Structure formats: C-alpha cells, structure tokens
Design a protein with these regions (language model features):
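Glycosyltransferase catalytic domains, chiefly GT-A lineage
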Residues: 1-193
C-alpha cells in the first residue's frame, strides 16, 4: 500500500496481516471466494462500514494520494458523490464494449446487463477512487449498486451509472487524466499481466 494520509483515519480492509504504511488494518473474514467481489463489497457499501462518518474516500490498492484528502473532500461541499471522469469511455455503451473487447466479463452477461438498462448514453466515471457523503440517498444508491453486482457482472463502472440515474443523482466527474494528475496517481496493478 502507498502511504496513508495522516490527516484522516485511513483504513485497509484485508483478510491477512500485511504491511500497511500507516494505514489502520482491519482483518476481515472472507465472505466470498472471489477476491474481486470481496473488495467491491467494501468499496460499494462504505456506509455500512463507516456508520458514524459523514463522508468517505475509497481508493483502490494501486492508488496513491498526491494531495491531502481534505483537498479531495472539498469537492463534496456541493455534491454527494465525486469520481474522476473515465479516461476513455464516454458512455455506458463504450464501457460495455470495452469490457467485452478486453474479456473482463462474459459477452452474454454484459449483453443481458445492458438489456436491463434503459439508457445507454449515461456518462461514466472511473471508480478507482470515489468520494461520497454518507446521506440516506447515497446509502440507498450504494445498496442498489451492490444489488446490481450480485445480479449482473462484477464490473462496477458498468452498474454505477444506471444506479445514479435511477436515484436522480448527478455525480461530479472530475476532468483529470486518470493516470497523470495532481490528485491521485493510479499505478499498474501488481502481478496483473
């Protein structure tokens, strides 16, 4: 893990003891055999793990904060959910096509999921880092988002726009280069070819 921001409570959920570079470690018992589903549960259902917290920032394990998290939390003053704009995909259709092209999920599952979504032109964000206020509406959004992942593919960027639209939530999609910006650096995943 990259160094934790010392100005906020930084928590790492893990199923085994690891060196965390300043993070508070919460050892959890695995609930799912698929580690992707496991990590997405903590990512999506943040309101369940941080019930007495006004807001939270999720960052994937391959992300490094380049600014204090207070700079990022400032984005939440006017909206309840913030993430970077997707670097290549503009719409849900673009995301679905890329998922199929890169074999990130079975084509049939992606097609079935897209058939379930009435609007394919929804804007898409990248969810490698995600800021949320813990409002009742955002908690309901999180639950619906998790439900989509239990019914359809595990591709969270595919299901989130549908849920945002369903709850009439307009996220703030920050216009930054996901891989080269002054806020959060996204590094290549280790051990992934």
């Amino acid at each position: 893990l990259y160094p934790a921001d010392k100005d906020v409570r930084s928590i790492c959920f893990t199923d085994r003891p690891i060196e965390t570079n300043g993070w508070e470690t919460v050892i959890v018992e695995r609930r799912f055999s698929d580690p992707r589903r496991e990590s997405r549960m903590y990512k999506i259902l943040a309101h369940q793990w941080f019930q007495n917290t006004a807001s939270s920032l999720w960052i994937d394990g391959n992300c490094e904060l380049l600014v204090s998290s207070s700079e990022l939390f400032a984005f939440l003053e006017k909206v309840d959910i913030v993430m970077p704009r997707h670097p290549t995909n503009k719409t849900l259709t673009d995301e679905a096509e890329l998922i199929v092209k890169l074999n990130k999920a079975p084509t049939e599952q992606v097609q079935k999921q897209m058939a379930h979504y009435p609007n394919h032109n929804l804007p898409i964000g990248a969810t490698s880092w995600l800021l949320r206020n813990h409002t009742n509406t955002i908690s309901s959004l999180n639950e619906a988002w998790w439900s989509e992942l239990t019914v359809h593919t595990l591709r969270d960027q595919l299901s989130l726009p549908y849920c945002l639209d369903r709850f009439k939530i307009s996220p703030y999609l920050i216009d930054v280069d996901l891989y080269n910006n002054k806020l959060v650096r996204v590094h290549p995943h280790r051990g992934v070819g």
